[in-house]
């Protein structure tokens, strides 16, 4: 606890200096005559990606301090939370100084960003370096390991700092998951089945699909922050369950930010109630997520647009009722400007007849994981969409409309990852406690095993606080990207 001043006054100051210097270097490499050079961005991919990691570490450490201070005000900053804060600070500061692992074989180090290690030897960094040396000791890790073990039966792995209302909502969805999802999820996965409709209907009754839709359009009007908490609990049971709401989120955000009032009134209440299941039809073969190279065409023809082209990796494509379909309405406009977004209504398919509409064909793409909604490739050959279903009833805005929704979708993706990570953590810990070695000793009693569990717990808490921060920033109307 005595290291609190180090966190706020020294460690973060040093991290800020490092980030500012890294940002200045990357800008000098990428900005030409006041504009981003795409050629230079390709050339300096490592540095640019490294900068994003440094920014994420910096924001995470700041949010961990905010988390700690908030708990402390409520006299809830106990030994578990204190050790988590101390260990994550020590570990992240050490990585910032010596190299952040961006993947198993890729690191970003100060020299990759034009910086020298002398930055970490300047006056005012003594506490930063002392924290690296002394904040993550074996004794402290074993203390936290014991606290986590003591809290295992009650699932007390540190205080996430939720208010009373949000805690009640979380507990409601946790019970739903434990009663209706967890007992069946593995069987759904092994059989590669669509999530049963009765589960979707129960989720509809609980308001999952209308959480963030305004009340005037049939939703609950809750915050992105609450949506994150709910999504984490759903994904903790089964990632497919946690992902179901994302389809509705993308569709709702598109409508709220870019739809006409008639379009909002037509679609939002049905999305909120779960009556209409949306899907996003974006990615194209050989284009990936490079929307500027999309070739699927939408040609105006009387009261309709005629869609022709191919799409792939369409999640929940067969069982959906409306597609958020991105197509090129102006072939003379290269890149992003000629794209338009459509609310393309279709009939709901099933395993026996995936795409019953005229003008659509396709098939399932088998996947190893992330099951429950299934992935599809879809071919459009003269498929008709009503002109009134052009989002915003104005051509050429599709890319802009789509990008306005991606921040919210990525925040929810982070919440899903938290749920999966929490499930993996709890499963790992249960196994380590229960499994005995040949001498009859629990695997958890081996320091190296317990230390891995400690790393999982601290990383998850840190990622959770960063995700909450991004959601709260979005709720305030702020951008939450780099």
Describe these PLM feature segments.
Residues 304, 308-358:
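A short core secondary-structure module
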Residues 296-298:
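A structural signal for short hydrophobic beta-strand segments in well-ordered beta-sheet cores
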Residues 274-282:
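A short, Trp-centered hydrophobic/proline-enriched beta-strand micro-motif
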Residues 1-7:
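Short, small-residue-biased leader/transition segments that mark boundaries at the very start
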Residues 27-38, 59-93, 97-112, 185-190, ...:
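C-terminal helix-coil-helix/basic helical segment that borders enzyme active sites and/or dimer interfaces
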Residues 19-43, 348-363, 374-410, 424-447, ...:
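A glycine-rich, basic-preceded beta-loop-alpha segment at the flavin cofactor/substrate interface
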């Amino acid at each position: 606890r005595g290291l609190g001043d180090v966190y706020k006054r020294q460690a973060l100051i040093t991290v800020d200096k490092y980030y500012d210097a890294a940002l200045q270097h990357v800008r000098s490499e990428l900005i030409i005559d006041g504009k981003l050079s795409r050629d230079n961005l390709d050339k300096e991919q490592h540095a640019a990606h490294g900068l994003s990691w440094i920014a994420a570490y910096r924001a995470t450490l700041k949010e961990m301090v905010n988390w700690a201070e908030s708990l402390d005000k409520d006299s809830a900053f106990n030994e578990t939370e204190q050790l988590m804060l101390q260990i994550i600070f020590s570990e992240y500061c050490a990585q910032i100084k010596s190299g952040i692992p961006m993947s198993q074989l890729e690191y970003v180090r100060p020299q990759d960003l034009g910086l020298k290690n002398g930055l970490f030897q300047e006056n005012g960094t003594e506490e930063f370096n002392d924290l690296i040396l002394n904040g993550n000791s074996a004794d402290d890790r074993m203390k936290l390991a014991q606290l986590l073990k003591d809290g295992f039966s009650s699932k007390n792995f540190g205080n996430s700092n939720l208010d009373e209302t949000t805690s009640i909502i979380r507990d409601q969805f946790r019970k739903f998951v434990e009663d209706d999802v967890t007992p069946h999820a593995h069987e759904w996965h092994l059989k590669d089945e669509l999530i049963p409709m009765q589960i979707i209907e129960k989720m509809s009754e609980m308001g999952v699909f209308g959480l963030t839709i305004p009340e005037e359009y049939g939703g609950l009007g809750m915050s992105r922050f609450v949506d994150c908490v709910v999504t984490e609990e759903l994904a903790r049971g089964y990632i497919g369950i946690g992902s179901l709401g994302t389809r509705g989120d993308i569709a709702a955000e598109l409508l709220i930010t870019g739809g006409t009032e008639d379009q909002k009134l037509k679609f939002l209440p049905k999305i909120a109630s779960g009556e209409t299941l949306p899907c996003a039809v974006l990615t194209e073969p050989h284009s990936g997520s490079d929307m500027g190279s999309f070739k699927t065409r939408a040609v105006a023809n009387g009261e309709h647009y005629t869609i022709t082209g191919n799409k792939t990796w369409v999640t929940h494509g067969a069982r959906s009722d409306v597609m958020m379909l991105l197509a090129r309405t102006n072939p003379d406009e290269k890149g992003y400007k000629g794209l338009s977004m459509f609310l393309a209504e279709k009939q709901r398919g099933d395993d026996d007849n995936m795409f019953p509409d005229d003008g659509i064909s396709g098939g399932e793409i088998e996947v190893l994981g992330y099951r429950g909604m299934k992935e599809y490739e879809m071919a459009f050959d003269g498929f008709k969409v009503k002109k009134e279903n052009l989002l915003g009833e104005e051509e050429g805005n599709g890319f802009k409309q789509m990008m306005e929704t991606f921040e919210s979708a990525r925040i929810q993706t982070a919440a899903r990852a938290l749920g999966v990570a929490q499930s993996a953590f709890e499963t790992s810990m249960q196994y380590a406690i229960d499994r005995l070695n040949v001498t009859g000793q629990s695997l958890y009693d081996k320091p190296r095993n317990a230390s891995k569990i400690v790393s999982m717990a601290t990383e998850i808490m840190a990622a959770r606080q960063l995700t909450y921060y991004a959601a709260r920033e979005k709720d305030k109307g702020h951008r939450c990207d780099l």
